[in-house]
Regions:
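Iron-sulfur cluster-binding electron-transfer modules in prokaryotic oxidoreductases
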Residues: 1-290
Length: 290
């Protein structure tokens, strides 16, 4: 997720959006929290909501979809149930008036798509990409309401503004296996392999994602996932964060967006996105000249 944080801050800064960190924020509890102790997880998230509220933030950016979901769910639960609010406030030792809510990066950019259009419209070539939302960007539908649960389009619309060609495909909201990547890597390889196969079948040349867990599984586990799906040892499909695509469209250089740290090499993809000749093609031409 380090690439995500670096590229997000750089891209939003280039877009003219300044980030201010919620003071003294804490972990949302992640998968371990909501699987083992919902009371603790709710209290952890109410504390973050209360901190954002105290800082005067009616809305705040939660770049990780899992964090955004946990925050939105806690907000929804305590707003609807005063007893849960009292319980969470006691545990967090903070008052919360239910006036602050999280938004994701996709929601932020889609809401500000006129600004994106003004600064970065058509700056990238019409490379075919699969926008992969993962299982949490639009779920549960009761709290993640900014897009359609099964057929979201907001990330596609932002990518299209940048000039990318988004493909229609079947697995844009299927789960990649998330945190099971450490305890059940075989299962993650199967799930991720199905996603790779579906994107490849739709003609995609790269993924665009906005979730660090999805990125990790598609990028880090791609070799074994491709093998599981029967795609062959040579299969490679680069995985870009939405923030990295935006940063390139805004003219930022690859190092500023941490594009050199992926498991699946992004060199040729970035060259194409910058309107340059891919490295492999250039090397082939040099060999022919010899």
């Amino acid at each position: 997720g380090l690439e995500y944080g670096i590229s997000l801050e750089a891209a939003l800064g280039a877009l003219g959006i300044t980030l201010k960190e919620v003071p003294d924020w804490n972990c949302c509890g992640a998968s371990a929290g909501h699987m083992t102790n919902t009371t603790l997880t709710r209290a952890l998230n109410v504390r973050n909501l209360a901190l954002a509220e105290a800082a005067g933030m009616s809305e705040f950016l939660a770049p990780c979809p899992l964090c955004a979901k946990e925050l939105a769910l806690a907000h929804h639960e305590v707003k609807e149930h005063p007893d849960l609010l009292a319980q969470a406030q006691d545990a967090a030792e903070m008052a919360y008036r239910c006036t602050s809510r999280p938004i994701t990066l996709v929601e932020l950019l889609h809401r500000n798509r006129d600004l994106v259009r003004e600064r970065a419209a058509g700056k990238l070539p019409d490379l075919k990409v699969a926008c992969y939302y993962g299982c949490l960007h639009t779920r549960p539908r009761e709290v993640m309401t900014f897009d359609d649960t099964e057929q979201p389009t907001t990330m596609d619309e932002v990518c299209q503004i940048l000039g990318l060609q988004t493909v229609e495909w079947t697995h844009k909201t299927e789960c990649c296996g998330a945190g099971f990547t450490m305890s059940k890597p075989g299962m993650v390889a199967r799930l991720t392999g199905r996603i790779l196969e579906a994107a490849s079948r739709a003609g995609a040349e790269a993924f665009v994602v906005a979730c660090p867990m999805c990125h990790a599984n598609l990028d880090m586990r791609q070799g074994e996932a491709a093998a599981d799906a029967g795609l062959g040892e040579e299969f490679q499909m680069p995985v870009l964060y939405l923030a990295q695509a935006l940063g390139l469209a805004l003219g930022l250089e690859p190092p500023a967006l941490s594009l050199g740290t992926h498991f699946v090499d992004t060199t040729d993809l970035v060259a194409r996105l910058q309107g340059q000749q891919p490295v492999a093609a250039a090397a082939s031409e040099i060999e022919q000249e010899k």
